[in-house]
């Protein structure tokens, strides 16, 4: 992943919160009575102490109890969720305590709030790299995909998308497993129909998945990702132009992605971005056009008809960026 893309996709849908101390996707919109808030505060203080495994173990035991009521499951999952949100050391202890498997089991619970607390607790745990492997080994991927598809609340679905993003960052095998489990069509749907937060989360997750496993690019194209990406690129008010452009560039690395982009009218969108976009947008649009033109005379003719030759000629200028100079060498036919 190049440095521009790393910066652009470094978050999971949050522009105003530090992911080391807060949930990186949907905000924690819970409200508590004074008594409940005081209890949570005592829990956080006790778990921050040196010998803090006792409270965590009690919460895990509560989740695992076959006699646990819905209320007790809500409370235990919520407290683990908040501890993982606020306490970096607590994330490691929770992951090592055996909490992941019972939290995963909550994703199929009938109660929407139990499910949401479970999803968000897993999301907060996944901030810690050590917990990613634990979650994958615990079989969290498929339940998270099911939550992304059918969780009762939008927050749970968006947080499931973010958790899948975190797991896909573990390695290429995990990224392929997330794609194989059926996450990509659901993320494309979230990209099309979600709110502003959901769209950003979906784009970030898709970019990571498509960068981490080549087969995921084909899955994204087959799921219809190109059309909503072009729509977002054409809408400055979306706040998604850069993210969508970088994700599209990832997809046009495949023949299927290039074909879908041309079929959906993407050449004109890219040419317009070259003409009126920011410097970063111009650069990624030119790189995508060059990728589309590579070894395809028909596409080169279409690009020329859209008026893209002048900006491509600019590749030969001394002030061209290093990336574009590299592509100039690769696609020297445009000199």
Write out the residue ranges for each language-model feature:
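Eukaryotic helix-linker segments that join adjacent hydrophobic helices
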Residues: 94-146
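Recurring C-terminal helix/loop segment of individual leucine-rich repeat
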Residues: 92, 133, 146, 173-176, ...
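Hydrophobic, ordered structural segments
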Residues: 143, 165-168
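Buried hydrophobic core positions in alpha-solenoid tandem helical repeats
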Residues: 59-60, 102-104, 143-146, 186-188, ...
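N-terminal "cap/leader" segments of large eukaryotic alpha-helical scaffolds
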Residues: 1-85, 90-93
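Structural recognition of alpha-solenoid helical scaffolds
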Residues: 55-58, 98-102, 139-140, 173, ...
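Alpha-helical solenoid repeats of the armadillo/HEAT superfamily
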Residues: 68-80, 111-124, 134-138, 152-166, ...
């Amino acid at each position: 992943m190049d440095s521009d893309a790393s910066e652009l996709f470094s978050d999971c849908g949050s522009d105003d919160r530090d992911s080391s101390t807060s949930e990186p996707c949907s905000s924690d919109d819970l409200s508590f009575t004074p008594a409940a808030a005081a209890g949570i505060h005592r829990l956080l203080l006790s778990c921050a102490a040196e010998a803090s495994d006792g409270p965590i173990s009690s919460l895990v035991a509560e989740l695992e109890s076959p006699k646990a009521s819905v209320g007790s499951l809500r409370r235990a999952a919520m407290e683990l969720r908040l501890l993982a949100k606020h306490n970096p050391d607590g994330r490691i202890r929770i992951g090592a305590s055996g909490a992941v498997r019972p939290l995963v089991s909550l994703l199929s619970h009938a109660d929407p709030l139990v499910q949401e607390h479970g999803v968000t607790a897993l999301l907060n745990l996944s901030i810690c790299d050590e917990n990613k492997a634990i979650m994958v080994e615990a079989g969290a991927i498929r339940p998270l995909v099911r939550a992304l598809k059918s969780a009762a609340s939008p927050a749970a679905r968006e947080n499931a998308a973010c958790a899948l993003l975190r797991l896909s960052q573990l390695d290429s095998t995990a990224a392929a497993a997330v794609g194989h489990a059926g996450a990509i069509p659901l993320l494309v749907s979230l990209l099309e129909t979600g709110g502003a937060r959901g769209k950003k989360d979906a784009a970030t997750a898709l970019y990571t998945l498509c960068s981490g496993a080549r087969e995921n690019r084909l899955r994204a194209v087959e799921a219809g990702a190109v059309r909503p990406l072009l729509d977002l690129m054409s809408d400055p008010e979306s706040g998604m132009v850069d993210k969508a452009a970088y994700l599209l560039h990832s997809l046009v690395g495949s023949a299927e992605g290039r074909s879908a982009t041309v079929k959906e009218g993407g050449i004109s969108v890219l040419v317009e971005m070259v003409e009126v976009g920011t410097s970063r947008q111009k650069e990624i649009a030119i790189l995508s056009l060059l990728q589309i033109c590579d070894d395809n005379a028909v596409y080169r003719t279409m690009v020329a008809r859209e008026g893209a030759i002048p900006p491509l000629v600019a590749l030969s200028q001394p002030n061209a960026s290093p990336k574009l100079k590299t592509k100039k060498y690769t696609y020297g036919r445009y000199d």
